[in-house]
């Protein structure tokens, strides 16, 4: 696999890093649709993903030693898609939206944790530092695209804001095609061989 494809596969994970903020575009419309719900509770839709991401960081490192990072990355993107797209169809209560926001945060947590891990695994020195800089730029670009796109889509109906998460399909395909599969079994064998008798 070429280095360019590998870089694309890893860097693309950074695009969704700030995507949980998309729903903040729709706060006023959601508040109007749920007048009996506390405003603070509605605002949690944009903040609870951070809790999901925090939870994820606690165990992704352990999972990465037992499961290929590519599988974990694809799983994270899938969770992000579920948390971001299902609310288009199921949005009858704030509790539902909060649940999907938590799932969204967990998915984002997978991607945010795995991206630097993969860069450290496949690249070294100045090349790694340069790619981390590019990753930061992609994160900023993704934030702008997601916020702007979500705002435009949700102009007439706040539920349409979530359509911006269709971008996860593209990210999923980029990772699926360009990121190599980790050989976890081989790593275990090497560790076993290196162990003293």
Placement of each model-derived feature along the sequence:
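Membrane-interface helix termini in secondary transporters
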Residues: 29, 58-62, 152
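Short hydrophobic/alpha-helical segments at membrane-entry points of transmembrane helices
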Residues: 95-101
């Amino acid at each position: 696999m070429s280095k360019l494809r590998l870089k694309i596969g890893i860097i693309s994970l950074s695009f969704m890093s700030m995507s949980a903020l998309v729903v903040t575009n729709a706060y006023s419309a959601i508040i109007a649709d749920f007048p009996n719900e506390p405003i603070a509770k509605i605002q949690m839709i944009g903040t609870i993903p951070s809790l999901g991401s925090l939870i994820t960081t606690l165990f992704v490192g352990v999972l990465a030693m037992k499961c290929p990072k590519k599988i974990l990355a694809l799983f994270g993107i899938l969770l992000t898609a579920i948390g971001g797209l299902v609310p288009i169809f199921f949005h009858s209560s704030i509790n539902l939206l909060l649940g999907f926001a938590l799932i969204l945060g967990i998915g984002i947590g997978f991607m945010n944790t795995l991206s630097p891990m993969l860069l450290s695994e496949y690249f070294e020195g100045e090349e790694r530092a340069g790619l981390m800089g590019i990753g930061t730029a992609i994160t900023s670009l993704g934030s702008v695209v997601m916020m702007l796109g979500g705002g435009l889509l949700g102009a007439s109906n706040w539920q349409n804001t979530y359509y911006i998460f269709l971008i996860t399909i593209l990210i999923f395909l980029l990772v699926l095609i360009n990121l190599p599969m980790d050989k976890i079994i081989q790593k275990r064998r090497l560790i076993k061989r290196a162990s003293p008798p």
